Design a protein with these regions (language model features):
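Structural signature of FAD isoalloxazine-binding scaffolds in flavoprotein oxidoreductases
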Residues: 157-162
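Adenylate-forming
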Residues: 115-121, 142-144, 163-165
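A charged helix-plus-loop insertion that forms the helical arch/lid used to bind
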Residues: 79-90
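Short loop/edge segments at beta-strand edges and connector loops
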Residues: 108-110, 116
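ATP-binding/phosphotransfer module of carbohydrate and carboxylate kinases, centering on a glycine-rich
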Residues: 1-65, 75-78, 96-106, 120-128, ...
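A short alpha->loop->secondary-structure connector
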Residues: 153-154
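Short beta-strand segments
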Residues: 10, 67-71, 109, 133-139, ...
Length: 331
């Protein structure tokens, strides 16, 4: 009899990360990563199906369910994607499309909900009843774990923390968001690259400037690499984004009084170069007692948290446990 598996898919604004877990542990048995930029909706759906099929073949089948984490707002009443800022998924009932295509039950949730489900149940915030999470990538995803459960809002539109306005007259937000001054416009991976680009144009004779002159692409990992080597432009870009993040954290502390704030996503590879300035601003702006007892931590599972959280939702679905997310089953 084939071993049983579940698959988790973390579909981001620039790439897909998917992996299979065994029936009982957190070991990622096989994984795949694929770019998603520039795809149409049909192309994206096909690419996702191909990635799941690749993993299924690699682990020898026995797939009980597939979980998806997607940076999108879903209407829990209809299963429709109603706000997909960085992906071509507007007005698609993703679970209903994927379940018959894959031939197994699927569960679909916002990607940050998957992140926080992982970190609050088996990760850095395990044991805490109230947790706030922000994932810093192309944009900023948000997740809330309140009173021991993922909070999604009345119809699924809750916890869009990246679209908290922190500057009423700030720069326009990205993608389909109509707002100005959203947190993700100043504290995301996109904002980090923008800050570094503006700074290096004024100070080209630095390690970052020389790296770009040599043909390296300006990315978050490059900025982190050179910041760790002491490059002043890279360090200041991370500190600028960290301070903006601290404003967002302070607002969330004043509203939710969580035990733990978890920061995940690709930008968290910068570690304390990002978190130290964030904590400093948070302590100046948040109120006591919330600011005095909170922990602000990097996600334990790093960039795998969304994928693992989606797989854990799939495991719940396969076991008949309530997921609170959108479920789909093959005909």
């Amino acid at each position: 009899m084939a071993a049983r598996h579940v698959i988790g898919v973390d579909l981001g604004g620039t790439k897909l990360l998917a992996g299979a877990l065994g029936a009982d542990d957190l070991t990622v048995i096989h994984r795949t990563s694929r770019p998603v930029l520039g795809l149409t909706q049909n192309q994206l759906v096909q690419m996702v199906a191909d990635a799941v099929q690749e993993i299924s073949v690699a682990v020898g089948g026995g797939i009980d369910a597939v979980g998806f984490g997607i940076p999108c707002t879903f209407d829990l009443r209809t299963g429709m994607a109603i706000q997909a800022v960085n992906l071509p998924l507007h007005d698609i009932a993703f679970a209903d499309v994927m379940a018959p295509r894959l031939g197994v039950p699927v569960v679909v949730d916002n990607d940050a909900n998957c992140h926080i489900y992982c970190e609050a149940t088996v990760g850095i915030a395990s044991g805490a009843s109230d947790v706030v999470l922000m994932t810093l990538g192309t944009g900023i995803g948000g997740g809330l774990f309140l009173c021991g459960e993922v909070y999604r809002g009345w119809i699924g539109g809750g916890a869009e923390l990246g679209h908290m306005v922190v500057d009423m007259d700030g720069r326009p937000c990205q993608g389909n968001c109509p707002n100005r001054g959203c947190l993700e416009s100043v504290a995301s991976g996109t904002a980090l690259v923008r800050e570094a680009s503006l700074a290096v144009a004024k100070q080209p004779n630095t390690a970052l400037g020389r790296a770009l002159e040599a043909g390296r692409e300006l990315t978050g990992p490059l900025i982190t690499e050179l910041a760790n080597g002491g490059d002043p432009v890279a360090l200041e870009a991370l500190a600028t984004v960290g301070r903006a993040l601290g404003v967002g954290i302070a607002n969330l502390l004043n509203i939710f009084n969580p035990q733990v704030v978890v920061i995940g996503g690709g930008v968290i590879g910068a570690g304390e170069l990002l978190l130290a300035p964030a904590r400093e601003v948070m302590r100046r702006r948040a109120l006591s007692p919330a600011k005095d007892v909170v922990r602000v931590e990097a996600a334990r599972f790093g960039p795998d948290a969304g994928m693992i959280g989606a797989a854990l939702l799939a495991r719940d679905l396969a076991a008949g446990r309530p997921t609170g997310a959108i479920e789909g089953r093959p005909a």
